[in-house]
From Swiss-Prot:
Monomer. A lipid is attached at C18 (S-diacylglycerol cysteine). Disulfide bonds: none annotated. This is Outer-membrane lipoprotein LolB. SUPFAM superfamilies: Prokaryotic lipoproteins and lipoprotein localization factors (SSF89392). A lipid is attached at C18 (N-palmitoyl cysteine). Belongs to the LolB family. Residues 1-17 form the signal peptide. The keyword Lipoprotein applies. InterPro entries: LolA/LolB/LppX, OM_lipoprot_LolB. It comes from Ralstonia pickettii (strain 12J).
Length: 207
């Protein structure tokens, strides 16, 4: 099942169209952590942009592209992955109760943490726990990290938990010293080793 969905995901993200999923039904989270909230809600941290991933599956290099919407409030995170045509392909939710992965035309999958869910279903996994802090230009707490900084004291790289995070581009306000407001434009994540081989992810933030 995981292998079949991974191939379908890759085809959709490369623009093959929505025929792979019957009726192209809109995928909405069964347990929406942000139901009833507004985009302007100051209690919600929101990132929106585009992603690309290169990963190894069955000893062959695979790739996927699309857009994403990340919403975060306290311990709750919800990540929506979409194809270039706008179809929602996967919804990942993480809370104190555990992790949920929802795919079109399949029952929700649940586990204590999200990384294994994504790896099994999609063929690659975004480091959701680390991204909560890396998107704020800081190491995640609780584990060792190596940080290299540029002349403006912004991080150039963070090495943590087997990942290297490269801060490639910043917005005009990127010299803001407040980590919660720092203007990250693009970051690349590389995991050279892992159970399923190397993984590279590029995130470009539009807002």
């Amino acid at each position: 099942m995981a292998m079949r969905f991974a191939h379908a995901l890759g085809a959709l993200m490369l623009g093959a169209g929505c025929a792979l999923f019957s009726g192209c039904a809109s995928l909405r989270p069964a347990n929406d952590l942000f139901a009833g909230t507004q985009d302007a809600d100051t209690n919600i941290t929101r990132y929106q942009g585009r992603f690309s991933a290169r990963y190894t599956q069955n000893n062959a290099e695979q790739s996927a592209v699309g857009s994403f919407l990340w919403r975060e409030r306290g311990p709750d995170v919800q990540l929506e992955l979409m194809s270039p045509l706008g179809q929602t392909l996967a919804i990942v939710s993480q809370s104190n109760q555990g992790a949920t992965l929802e795919l079109p035309n399949q029952p929700p999958r649940r586990a204590p943490e999200v990384d294994t869910l994504m790896q099994d279903a999609l063929g690659f996994s975004l480091p959701v726990s680390g991204l909560r802090d890396w998107l704020r230009a800081r190491p995640a707490p609780g584990t060792p990290a190596r940080v290299a900084r540029d002349a403006q004291s912004r991080p150039e790289t963070i090495e943590q938990n087997g990942w290297t995070v490269h801060y490639v581009a910043w917005t005009d306000d990127g010299n803001n010293t407040d980590g919660a407001k720092v203007g990250i434009r693009r970051l690349d994540l590389d995991r050279p080793q892992g159970t399923n081989g190397p993984l590279s992810v590029r995130l470009v933030l539009d807002q």
